[in-house]
Amino acid sequence: MKGTPSFGKMNKSHTHIRCRRCGRNAYNVSKHYCAACGFGRTKKIRRYSWQNKKVNGVRIR
C-alpha cells in the first residue's frame, strides 16, 4: 500500500528514545543523534542560553 493510507502508519514507532548521555527523550533513532545534547553528532555538549528554564519561568545559566 502506498500514498495516503500509509501516512497513518508513520506514528507507530518512536522517533526519539532516551539519550544515554543527557537522559532526555531526544535521541533520534533514524538519524542517530540527540536533538537535546548533540550526542552522536559532536563531542561537545550542545548548549544554548535560551535552552533551560526553571519551573517558575526564570532562565538558569
UniProtKB/Swiss-Prot annotation:
GO terms for biological process: translation. Keywords: Metal-binding, Ribonucleoprotein, Ribosomal protein, RNA-binding, rRNA-binding, Zinc, Zinc-finger. Zn(2+) binds at C19, C22, C34, C37. GO terms for cellular component: cytosolic large ribosomal subunit. One of its GO terms (molecular function) is zinc ion binding. Its cofactor is Zn(2+). Binds 1 zinc ion per subunit. A zinc finger (C4-type) spans 19-37. It comes from the Archaea. InterPro entries: Ribosomal_eL37, Ribosomal_eL37/eL43, Ribosomal_eL37_CS, Ribosomal_zn-bd. Belongs to the eukaryotic ribosomal protein eL37 family. NCBIfam families: PRK04179.1. Binds to the 23S rRNA. HAMAP family: Ribosomal_eL37 (MF_00547). PANTHER family: 60S RIBOSOMAL PROTEIN L37, RIBOSOMAL PROTEIN L37. This is Large ribosomal subunit protein eL37. It comes from Saccharolobus solfataricus (strain ATCC 35092 / DSM 1617 / JCM 11322 / P2).
